[in-house]
Amino acid sequence: MKDCSNGCSAPFAGERGSEEVAETFRAKDLIITPATVLKEKPDPDSLVFGATFTDHMLTVEWSSASGWEKPHIKPFGNLPIHPAASVLHYAVELFEGLKAFRGVDNKIRLFRPDLNMDRMCRSAVRTTLPMFDKEELLKCILQLLQIDQEWVPYSTSASLYIRPTFIGTEPSLGVKKPSKALLFVILSPVGPYFSSGSFTPVSLWANPKYIRAWKGGTGDCKMGGNYGASLLAQCEAVENGCQQVLWLYGKDNQITEVGTMNLFLYWINEDGEEELATPPLDGIILPGVTRQSILELAQQWGEFKVCERHLTMDDLATALEGNRVKEMFGSGTACVVCPVSDILYKGQMLHIPTMENGPKLASRILGKLTDIQYGRVESDWTIELP
């Protein structure tokens, strides 16, 4: 078969017949260079999301010639990067987001990190970045957390955000699969994602002129380009007095995601059934870890129908007219659960009676998830820092 022009169908030159190429990195090979000057830890109550960083970071370099280098935990600092690196020109990159929580028993826990590692590998395939052993990456992250564990806030309203990032670093302006890459992990102590508070409802701006993702695209991958391309719509949402964008898709204005969140609708459906519904994973929805956890929790409860289905703005408007909507809320690692109170659509503000209804379900889900995350309830969804 003839090679495609971007080199996707052919192995790198350094991969042909070489037994020296390291197919993955190993946690046992970690090189640790401790920081000589440690920063002052911030007050958990004063944290701004993503603005403060810990003392150390993890880096692992890769090249087609030699494969993976040894992982390195080093003092937090700037990255040396070539001006022609593919990440800077063609957005060859991906990232993840997960959290470490200091429990009521002072133990540090991660919430379902295996799902983040799985998603990171799927995104790597889509971006043509090299594979690695996801269990080894998790071991390296745990070692990084062990070193910076005092940065995990002593608070049940704050956490330590973990940001693994994977970028193409080949110094070339050619549009092709990169022959060099860098995987790095940074840590940031965080409070509530939204400045208005962790459980204050948000308003949404829905306008079909902007589209977040489409079939065959990268909407189901956690890639920076998906977020950078959303900023103009987010600015317009704020100009219209709303806090987030409700992304629509197709001629029937299907409801997909909310800004940085998956979306749930708790309602009485067209058949008169009590139902918790969320858009399906059809290639344009990010498969959120919190989303999956909410679906599994609700299915375990068995108290109402739980459904992954397409929802349109007409479905929502009709349900609102019939007083069939109970709650709407977003979900995500950063926000956990966030109620929705209003949607601005076609010049009309649609009020969602989420807060008038408690919100009983959103509050229950938030309570259950945070009980697990902060160790108030034992669960196999968490792993403890050794």
Swiss-Prot record:
This is Branched-chain-amino-acid aminotransferase, cytosolic. NCBIfam families: ilvE_II, PRK13357.1. Catalyzes the first reaction in the catabolism of the essential branched chain amino acids leucine, isoleucine, and valine. It is found in: Cytoplasm. The modification N6-(pyridoxal phosphate)lysine is found at K222. Keywords: Acetylation, Amino-acid biosynthesis, Aminotransferase, Branched-chain amino acid biosynthesis, Cytoplasm, Lipid metabolism, Pyridoxal phosphate, Transferase. PANTHER family: BRANCHED-CHAIN-AMINO-ACID AMINOTRANSFERASE, CYTOSOLIC, SUBGROUP IIII AMINOTRANSFERASE. Belongs to the class-IV pyridoxal-phosphate-dependent aminotransferase family. It comes from the Eukaryota. PROSITE patterns: AA_TRANSFER_CLASS_4. It is an enzyme of class 2 (transferase). One of its GO terms (molecular function) is L-leucine-2-oxoglutarate transaminase activity. The modification N-acetylmethionine is found at M1. It comes from Mus musculus. Its main location: cytoplasm. One of its GO terms (biological process) is branched-chain amino acid biosynthetic process. InterPro entries: Aminotrans_IV (IPR001544), Aminotrans_IV_CS (IPR018300), Aminotransferase-like (IPR036038), B_amino_transII (IPR005786), BCAT-like_C (IPR043132), BCAT-like_N (IPR043131), BCAT_family (IPR033939). Expressed in brain and kidney. Overexpressed in MYC-induced brain tumors, lymphomas, as well as in a teratocarcinoma cell line. The keyword Cytoplasm applies. GO terms for cellular component: cytosol; mitochondrion. It catalyses: L-leucine + 2-oxoglutarate = 4-methyl-2-oxopentanoate + L-glutamate; L-isoleucine + 2-oxoglutarate = (S)-3-methyl-2-oxopentanoate + L-glutamate; L-valine + 2-oxoglutarate = 3-methyl-2-oxobutanoate + L-glutamate. Its cofactor is pyridoxal 5'-phosphate. Homodimer. Gene3D superfamilies: 3.30.470.10, D-amino Acid Aminotransferase, subunit A, domain 2.
